[in-house]
């Protein structure tokens, strides 16, 4: 130790960094740690703490160091929140410490610390973990004790000189357990004042021998008698960390006195320490090791050894091994600073509670007053020390009164609230409901009374442990896991990645990842997988918001998820946290091989909320998720807080409101062209009614609502008889009363309702005195405005009048066709009308419930009773006013409501909604030479059967989709650029949707989406299987051919051909051919929108030209999309014999398809144009030019792969092509569309457009030729 540096405590504290040091950099001294015989838990291993690479190891000093000092008992001079931990002092400064290999002789002796960890702390400067140490001077070992085998609990300076005759009892045995230090009120012997004395209890399994002596040790001891010893007083309580080290070992105490105490009415004999008490260190018998019981298996208690993976909520929740959690919730527990992430701890007398939650099974280690924890190895990581909180909150008191499963659940809820940046913005709520209070309020509303556990004092629970109910924990718990959205989304991604990894191990890549083109041909949501909330056992927490793309999302601080058409009450608030207990999770676009596999093989875990698992697989599937929920599925957490619902009712005090009805919504459209921004405003067409609602809600009514939502059935709902104008019935229709009294029912999401009186006042012109007519206006919103999403076509709404209100009819000069800018902060309420005594919707044409409370996600099953619709405000009007309001409420049916299906009773009912499915009479127009579709606007509702990425004569080349909708057993086709409708979350097969204002094409059952068309998703079938493919030829390896039985917008399916083919002579021909060359190839990314990136590759081929030969003639065949995919053979697996290519692709992934690896290149360069200047490909590829739009150059491997792609197409099979001829106008159109020079004039080749492509099966072709000969 000549070159060893001596550090002082002051040096470490002043430096203020976490470091570790040792006396030797090459070898470590022998440790004094005890040779504990208990084995480590099989699940625990040192590598468990190294799995998280984000943890940082303690910084080691690069030179040998030692520290000299003295280990002392706790004292009041060192203010430590943990109160009872060892002290280490070098004479100048004192800090907290813990020591491995503890020996009695170390107390008060000077030691040399050979290896150590130091962690800075705010309260006392720092904490020293002593790993290896040795005595400095063995001659001073007897300075404190009279003998090597005895240590007086109180120094001789304070102890009585005369021995007390009552202090003659002794106890020897095995120390089973130790309680925390607590305070007991006692009477002062000098005065009559009450003083609080600290102390702690120990439980010893003692021997029946009368007197303890060293000479009697060698006789056999039988430790069979249960004895309790109370260490009383400040000096005795300071021995708590020493006695904690002795749990499970032999000890002896002498100089005790006996006291008879009463616990729950029963007497109990307890030994109490005195001023003369002496503690004798552990000993070993000369006849062998004394048998001892380290693991107590009586009841549900035992011992557990494991590594600490994480500490949460200031050490109340400790993560041990997988699905093993230690609860340290009792405020009085004395915990060591050294219980840190990465340390190995040994827990004794802990409750084992195997609990089965709805989301999975968890082993809970419940600590009680008998639990003791010792650290066997210190953590090597730079993690924070465990510091007890001196403040006892109402949440901590509440948690202590619960059973262990309920404690764990409550702590997880508390951690979930950490995912939110801020609590509710209302100042009153912010003051009264912080995160602890919010957790307590939420837990009280969810935890049943059976999970509350009455608590006794520390004496009761320690001495009468078996009778305190600690061993009667329920094994089944119905509390669902509460998760924020970020944790939920992350876990679903991990779950999918693990499932994909398993598939790749079990099957070959070609079986599960190489899909034929028919698998990929659908638009979005081809293969949906649905998980119910009952399957996951998870309740979601989040805030509602409208994203910039127009989607409604549930979000928290770090993540979000799309929400599928929820019908929410208008009192939603973006700043309030919502609870979603009932929902459907829709996972879309996954491979068919994954659909029938168990998605919940790895259930949700507590660690999913606390410490999400990092994604194990990169470059994997990108699948969109969405939630489907309804009114009853989204509630505010503060719904029981009085301020929450009173604030809603206060809005209706002494104010008047405008009434309007939504007639149409214009969709949020993405531009669809790179470099051009999306729309900055969205619009809603509305009809402003010439009535104002005047409310008279009083303070008393707002403070005390009449009833709650569960009491709102028609039988028990309270009624107030409305004032009915007796002369109203006799008046003519043109004689409109100035005011109509009505009854108003106000509802909010907090389940509270309020019934009050109100008045409808009509708006009359000043000069004539006649009533105003309804005004049709255009409401302008920003896309992020939540009001846009909440407004439903056909719904009536209330808006409160304001000082700068431009919505007033007759007051601010509003007129027809005015555009009104809607402010985002404007509050709206949905409104429904009912007449006479009917308050709920009974199916009448005159009652208009405008916001449905039923779930948006409808599962097809029989005998499902749908809940009645519900709105924010209901107006009960006199029956005489029914005819008056029908003018305003029913005059829009001809414009926006679809025509009924006559008397045909074969209406399908694939969802639980009570709305009747309608169909529109398509316009029957004569053929026209116009390039644009001609027809009437229609509105209808039906079931989406399929969405095909095909081309049409009425839409552009690259973004056309055909929506097949089943309406009254008739197939209706709708064409249009569906991807531009950014709000269509969850749209696809199995969706029931209503299509508003779509344009007829003049052909039967054929329609087109326009920029004014709006699609509303009503419900979604819960299907876990892919859609049934239409019957196709078994030999086809490409898209199924479009047969006459299917929808064909016109005879020609090619985009360019049909745009200019205005005659019937341009028929398509079929021929078998071989690819000679790839003349032109345009590759680009399909979309920048992540929702478009389904399980297919994100490559778009807007144009491709192939030189083909049918044996007699050579053609220049142009095509796009999936037909080009098929000819290029992108869906086939890469051949293994292509050595260079395979080596290149393995650097990216081991996925087998050509399309996947091409996607890697296109994703980088955005757009690639390949052009061949010759009619055939030369061997050296000298006539091929490749242009990219990105700033990066093609790498050598990328250039080689693209040229190999052309060779792969040339070496392909014989194709059967159905094509139509092209003229120069069509070619020029394609050149302008794709901004390329096709230069077809220099080749004397006929240009054709390939409409259908499929591989020729020789047997099928021979059979068809034979059939043709036979038929001829």
UniProtKB/Swiss-Prot annotation:
GO terms for molecular function: DNA binding. Keywords: Chromosome, DNA-binding, Nucleus, Telomere. The keyword Nucleus applies. GO terms for biological process: telomere maintenance. Disruption phenotype: Severe telomere deprotection accompanied by a rapid onset of developmental defects and sterility. The large majority of plants have grossly distorted floral phyllotaxy with an irregular branching pattern and fasciated (thick and broad) main and lateral stems and siliques. Although most mutants produce an influorescence bolt, this structure is highly variable in size, ranging from very short to wild-type. Flowers and siliques are often fused, and seed yield is typically reduced to 10% of wild-type. The germination efficiency of the few seeds that could be recovered was extremely low. Signal peptide: none annotated. InterPro entries: CTC1-like, CTC1_plant. It is found in: Nucleus; Chromosome, Telomere. GO terms for cellular component: chromosome, telomeric region; nucleus. It comes from the Eukaryota. The keyword Chloroplast does not apply. Component of the CST complex, a complex that binds to single-stranded DNA and is required to protect telomeres from DNA degradation. The CST complex binds single-stranded DNA with high affinity in a sequence-independent manner, while isolated subunits bind DNA with low affinity by themselves. Associates with enzymatically active telomerase. Belongs to the CTC1 family. Component of the CST complex, composed of CTC1, TEN1 and STN1. Interacts with POT1A. This is CST complex subunit CTC1. It comes from Arabidopsis thaliana (Mouse-ear cress). The lineage of its organism: Eukaryota, Viridiplantae, Streptophyta, Embryophyta, Tracheophyta. The gene is CTC1.
